[in-house]
């Protein structure tokens, strides 16, 4: 059975004795920085000139430096920019400021796993990945709880990288819930697979096909939306609370029987074979290569696919129906129906 690491197993003073630069102040960046500071760690924020996040970081009491200056100042550099921007950020601002004894921290292993970033000799490279979005990481920390983390070490030049990684994980509150040891390869490949095959790609396509099937059969779009998208949250919440078993325990006998007899007709064995092909593309680096090449070219495929998704009729139906939901409160910085960030 996997060993779980908790607060009692890690020495917080290790990260408290280091100067930490958090590069990026988005979802994960703000949570890591605030939690570390509340844990007694000296933190500065690294942001490019003109960054829209600068005002927020300064309002929350942080010193903001350029990524280059922050990296030169720090002992521990935490790179929390989007995957596609990390390579350029590292080359332009971080690499030349890395000296023996410093540590690079990532929350996702993409750029290390696929070779887009290579640290110089003498630098530790670690992964501390909370299994939740940044606002949840921060909220749980403030409540005296934590979000579970997975932790890995790619390069242990100092011989003490694991100890510092666990200390960092404790500093952001992750070991209150528990930490699991992994590798950069395992974290990256399973994370991408989960996103593509199940959580994002698989679920989005399943919902769209369900909506289209009901619409093509003559049912009202509003009813179709409720049945294949709106109620999905109710089912996922049950699965989150107690697994598939609790979800099946909570629904009617009719729904449970339909689950058993019709689920395999929709998600048939060939779907599993397709999943294996998706995983193979991830493992071989084919997906990463396709993504980065598209991003380097200005993201034409990415933007075309995003636009196509936004134009699906389920989106216009949803925008109208969500106006009826008194309990629905959108994020302040989100425009309903838009994927663009």
UniProtKB/Swiss-Prot annotation:
Species whose genome carries this gene: Clavibacter michiganensis subsp. michiganensis (strain NCPPB 382)
Cofactor note: Binds 2 magnesium ions per subunit.
Binding site for Mg(2+) 2: 191, 227, 231
Record family assignment: Belongs to the ketol-acid reductoisomerase family.
Name this polypeptide is given: Ketol-acid reductoisomerase (NADP(+))
Residues that hold NADP(+) according to the record: 25-28, 48, 51, 53, 83-86, 134
Entry function: Involved in the biosynthesis of branched-chain amino acids (BCAA). Catalyzes an alkyl-migration followed by a ketol-acid reduction of (S)-2-acetolactate (S2AL) to yield (R)-2,3-dihydroxy-isovalerate. In the isomerase reaction, S2AL is rearranged via a Mg-dependent methyl migration to produce 3-hydroxy-3-methyl-2-ketobutyrate (HMKB). In the reductase reaction, this 2-ketoacid undergoes a metal-dependent reduction by NADPH to yield (R)-2,3-dihydroxy-isovalerate.
GO terms assigned for molecular function: ketol-acid reductoisomerase activity; magnesium ion binding; NADP binding
Sorted UniProt keywords: Amino-acid biosynthesis, Branched-chain amino acid biosynthesis, Magnesium, Metal-binding, NADP, Oxidoreductase
GO annotation (BP), single: L-valine biosynthetic process
Annotated binding of substrate, by residue: 252
PROSITE patterns: KARI_C, KARI_N
Cofactor: Mg(2+)
Enzyme class, spelled out: oxidoreductase
Pathway the protein takes part in: Amino-acid biosynthesis; L-isoleucine biosynthesis; L-isoleucine from 2-oxobutanoate: step 2/4; Amino-acid biosynthesis; L-valine biosynthesis; L-valine from pyruvate: step 2/4
InterPro entries assigned: 6-PGluconate_DH-like_C_sf (IPR008927), KARI (IPR013023), KARI_C (IPR000506), KARI_N (IPR013116), KARI_prok (IPR014359), NAD(P)-bd_dom_sf (IPR036291)
Gene3D superfamilies, per database record: 6.10.240.10, NAD(P)-binding Rossmann-like Domain
Documented EC number(s): 1.1.1.86
Domain KARI N-terminal Rossmann: 2-182
Residues annotated as the enzyme's active site: 108
KARI C-terminal knotted domain location: 183-328
Binding site for Mg(2+) 1: 191, 195
């Amino acid at each position: 059975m996997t060993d779980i690491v908790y607060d009692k197993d890690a020495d917080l003073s290790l990260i408290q004795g280091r100067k930490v630069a958090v590069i990026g102040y988005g979802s994960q960046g703000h949570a890591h920085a605030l939690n570390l500071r509340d844990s007694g760690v000296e933190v500065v924020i690294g942001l490019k000139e003109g960054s829209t996040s600068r005002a927020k970081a300064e309002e929350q009491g942080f010193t903001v430096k350029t990524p280059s200056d922050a990296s030169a100042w720090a002992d521990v550099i935490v790179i929390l920019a989007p995957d596609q921007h990390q390579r350029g950020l590292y080359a332009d601002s971080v690499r030349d400021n890395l000296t023996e004894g410093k540590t690079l921290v990532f929350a996702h292993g993409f750029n290390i796993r696929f070779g887009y970033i290579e640290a110089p000799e003498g630098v530790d490279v670690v992964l501390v990945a909370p299994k939740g979005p940044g606002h949840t990481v921060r909220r749980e920390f403030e409540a005296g709880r934590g979000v579970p983390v997975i932790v890995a070490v790619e390069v242990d030049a100092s011989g003490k990288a694991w100890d510092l990684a666990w200390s960092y994980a404790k500093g952001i509150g992750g070991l209150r819930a528990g930490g699991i040891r992994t590798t950069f390869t395992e974290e990256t490949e399973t994370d991408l697979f989960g996103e593509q095959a199940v959580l994002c790609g698989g679920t989005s396509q399943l919902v769209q096909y369900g909506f289209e099937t009901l619409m093509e059969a003559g049912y009202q779009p509003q009813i179709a939306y409720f049945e294949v998208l709106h109620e999905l949250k109710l089912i996922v919440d049950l699965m989150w609370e107690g697994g598939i078993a609790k979800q099946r325990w909570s629904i009617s006998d009719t729904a449970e029987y339909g689950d058993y007899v019709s689920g395999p007709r929709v998600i048939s064995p060939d779907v599993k074979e397709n999943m294996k092909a998706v995983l193979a593309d991830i493992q071989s680096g084919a997906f990463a290569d396709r993504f980065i090449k598209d991003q380097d070219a200005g993201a034409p495929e990415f933007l075309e696919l995003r636009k196509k998704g936004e134009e699906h009729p389920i989106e216009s139906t949803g925008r109208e129906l969500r106006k009826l939901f008194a309990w629905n409160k959108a994020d302040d910085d989100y425009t309903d129906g838009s994927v663009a960030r």
